[in-house]
Amino acid sequence: MYKDIIDQYNKAIFEVYMKRSLVSLEDNGFKYKGINVLQCPINPDYNEPKFQPTINLWDIVSCNKDLKFFVGQLFLYRDLINNPLEELMPIENGKLISTYYQNLYDRRYCSFITCCFEKSYNFWDRIGDTIASFFPDLLKIHQVDFSRIIDQIKTQQIEIEHFFWLLNFKENEYQELNRYRKDFVNYYQFESKYRYDHSMNLSDLIGLEKIWAEKYGFPEYFKKHLELSSEGYYQMFSFLEQIQNERNRS
């Protein structure tokens, strides 16, 4: 009954993918920079029942693919959302205040922002699980996350270029992402925080410009994180492959 509508919707999303050059790990036949994404190195000596490498790999691919979908949604909806600088109402003394009669497009856009944070964090959490499976003595499985395992490996003084990429990402882009994520996933959703910030800046145009610039800029922000996640997978893959080769030679 709704197939035609769904097909038209998907056509619009695919056009956004093309226009914005949004690419996931499953695109191009699961090939990325010369590697087969589905042939991720596995530690055959790691026998932790709570870690299933095949399921974990598909979770990585799915989170990356889902992030691409939600980034596409952000670009699709952005030009239709409420702009607080264009929705001003005069009050006494000639002052203007910003209103926020949220439309449907804005509501969904806000929801997709929170989804992007969730998918980004889940992706890196699974990357951390994969890396930790090669270093089982560094952390107990319930302690593992991306940041902790990278910090632990750093103490091992491993001199591998691919690890340095992961470390640099962890100490820069990931820290910012995780700071956002803690606010918008653990505590309040993006929409709730935005509503509060808007209410605190109703007549402050400079303050409104700041929160609007952040909200409007999230599609580009998450496009960058989509690219970083694919590159991060490649760096993890190459790092573990090198670790595996060195261990096989010893």
Residue map of PLM features:
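Phosphate/anion-contacting hairpin/loop surfaces
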Residues: F123
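Extended HEAT/HEAT-like alpha-solenoid repeat tracts in very large eukaryotic scaffold/adaptor proteins
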Residues: Y109-S120
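Short acidic, low-complexity segments enriched in Ser/Thr/Gly/Pro
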Residues: N83-K95
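Acidic, Ser/Thr/Gly/Pro-rich intrinsically disordered interaction regions
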Residues: M1-K65, I91-G94, Y100-S111, D129-S250
